[in-house]
Amino acid sequence: MVQISEVKGNSRDNRTAAHTHIKGLGLNSQGIAEKQASGFVGQTTAREACGVVVDLIKAHKMAGRGVLLAGGPGTGKTALALAISQELGTKIPFCPITGSEIYSTEVKKTEVLMENFRRAIGLKVRETKEVYEGEVTELTPEEAENPLGGYGKTITTLLIGLKSAKGQKKLRLDPSIYEAIQKERVTVGDVIYIEANTGACKRVGRSDAYATEFDLEAEEYVPIPKGEVHKKKEIVQDVSLHDLDVANARPQGGQDIMSMMGQLMKPKMTEITDKLRSEINKVVSKYIDQGVAELVPGVLFIDEAHMLDVECFTYLNKALESPISPIVVLASNRGMTGIRGAEDLVAAHGIPPDFLSRLLIIPTTAYDPEEIKRIVKIRSTTEGVKITEAAIDKIAEHGVRISLRYCLQLLTPASILAKVNGRNEIDVQDVAECEDLFLDARRSAALLSSEQGQEFIC
């Protein structure tokens, strides 16, 4: 019996996250925000300001500066930062962190900040490779007397003829390449390529002109390469400065048992010294001066920036002034509040005034009922949920009265309740049932403060 097996695809279903519907800032060609575009609704002023920031980043004129997205909870600050990253594309580094991520028992908080700073700075390295590619027409090693004496002879040079579709060349190669050619078992009629920079030689296969030479042969026949024998190829690699730091701080390698055991064990989080970073900066500057590499300042996004303490803000002050620094985008939903680490000092957004004066502040405003209604429609389409107009009005009412997050979280449970009740669409009854099953923050707080809620308190 012939075995037939089904090949299953390896594609995964992507989880619908809170900002899956955001595809960009939704600006037209003049940089003016449309009322509803790319998953965004409202916040036209903030989106236009972020569009200007994106243009400055792409023009490499914003490095070493800071932006603060300030507004209440649920006004789209994280969505704006995500839209900035999507507008920039994959070639410009975008490193998102939260303010509480930097606190660790193993590593200093300033070290974690610097690591993320270096992650947000990219380096575009251009390398030009010279390649000789063609069918071997001649292979002649030139010998000479051994300079050390004796009867033996040594190979001084190797003459090799290569033929391509557009012409042929005769090359005189170093004797070290002869060893590589011997290892590859290259003979006349084989198609090979030789890298001029490294001297690496690779046998591609046998020329298809010799395909009828033998009846039985386990050879791979390839056509003669197109174009000239001598070709130049430009290879562009994108790396971050943190990748270079890690590669030099913890070099991999070693075939002894201790090295192999060290690679298997969980690596301990260690600090990268300032001396190593300064050496890497020197090498990077040298490459930039030579035109081999190009620095690409990216974006470091710090959400919940009020969670940073005084020491972190002092360090950020210094880091922003360094010659190699990214664009720092912070987000905070606090008003006048105490600064962490110096609670007696009250400042706007929980950020010290000296650091706040460095930032361009983009405010976000609360959504009106009509905008919340549109957001509910977009989210229902994204989550694949059918909903009636009356139910949209009811959910939007919760968004105005309670919060946008709470009303959007009701969509999926309401769709499950609608299916249980034998309906394809979410109706007002399903929303009301969800409201009874799931409390919002205000009702929960009111319940705990009442006499009925005393039994919940231990």
From Swiss-Prot:
This is RuvB-like helicase 1. ATP binds at G71, G72, P73, G74, T75, G76, K77, T78. It comes from Neurospora crassa (strain ATCC 24698 / 74-OR23-1A / CBS 708.71 / DSM 1257 / FGSC 987). It catalyses: ATP + H2O = ADP + phosphate + H(+). Keywords: Activator, ATP-binding, Chromatin regulator, DNA damage, DNA repair, Helicase, Hydrolase, Nucleotide-binding, Nucleus, Transcription, Transcription regulation. The keyword Nucleus applies. The gene is hel-1. DNA helicase which participates in several chromatin remodeling complexes, including the SWR1 and the INO80 complexes. The SWR1 complex mediates the ATP-dependent exchange of histone H2A for the H2A variant H2A.Z leading to transcriptional regulation of selected genes by chromatin remodeling. The INO80 complex remodels chromatin by shifting nucleosomes and is involved in DNA repair. Also involved in pre-rRNA processing. Pfam families: TIP49, TIP49_C.
